[in-house]
């Protein structure tokens, strides 16, 4: 099964997988670079890092993956959230993923610098608000995900609602995706969306014989 590319703003990931940002000092430059080198999007967990350490991690990731897509994941609830985002943008980070809260200010920072901002959401309402504020994409987390959760509902319930709510940005499902069957199940939620670039024949095969994909 050939997976479609993931387009976020001007970024194009050959493999539509974003590695989660696990704080503190778990998702570091080396993990992010390894994922980026395989065609996915690697994230450095910024929360809990001093600004100079974050700069070092971003620079190291760039050295290890010169052409890969490297982003940060930061918790909005963290005291130094704005400073972490500003520092990452100054270092030329490719995108900013933000969860554990919601910040309108981050969209202005992203717009000013041309950096894609990708909030983690748990409802169609917040996804719609995010798109209106300028989000380049949204990540949908349900109760299956780890970390700081905003709902007790399954992502499998929320994702179709978000897909219907937003108009022109990618929707990335997160949490509870453990194997190939889970990937197929999630992909089937996006079949009717215009941003899902998969041949109609492939879509039909997945619907009929998901166990063989």
Where are these regions (language model features)?
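Active-site entrance/lid segments in N-terminal catalytic domains of soluble metabolic enzymes
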Residues: 1-172
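Catalytic metal-binding/acid-base residues of hydrolase active sites
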Residues: 23, 177-178
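Conserved active-site-proximal phosphate/metal-binding subdomains
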Residues: 31, 145-148, 152-172, 178-213
